[in-house]
């Protein structure tokens, strides 16, 4: 594979990492809201935040798997050159 294609793949990998980092930041913000709810309970908001937290966690796991698979593909391409 030519170097331009590898650079394109590495750029895509950086974007995937950015997506994962953004999702992790969302989880952190959700955790802040959940913590605030200890002082000001709101059952509906707590339930919504639990769902949002789970969805964001699932997204992080999915993106992490995609990143791992994509890194393997990049490494295989680098080796095959």
What kind of region is each of these model predictions?
Residues 2-35:
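N-terminal acidic leader/helix
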Residues 2, 6, 39-46:
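Short, structured coil/loop segments at alpha-helix boundaries
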Residues 26-30, 44, 51, 63-66, ...:
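General "foldedness" signal
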Residues 36-41, 67-81:
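Long amphipathic alpha-helical coiled-coil segments
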Residues 41-59:
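Short, glycine/alanine-rich amphipathic alpha-helical segment
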Residues 23, 55-73:
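Amphipathic alpha-helical coiled-coil segments
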């Amino acid at each position: 594979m030519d170097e331009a294609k590898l650079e394109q793949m590495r750029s895509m990998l950086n974007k995937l990492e950015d997506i994962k980092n953004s999702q992790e930041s969302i989880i952190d913000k959700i955790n802040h809201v959940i913590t605030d709810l200890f002082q000001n309970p709101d059952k509906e908001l707590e339930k919504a935040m639990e769902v949002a937290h789970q969805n964001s966690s699932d997204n992080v796991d999915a993106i992490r798997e995609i990143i791992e698979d994509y890194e393997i593909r990049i490494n295989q391409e680098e080796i095959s050159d």
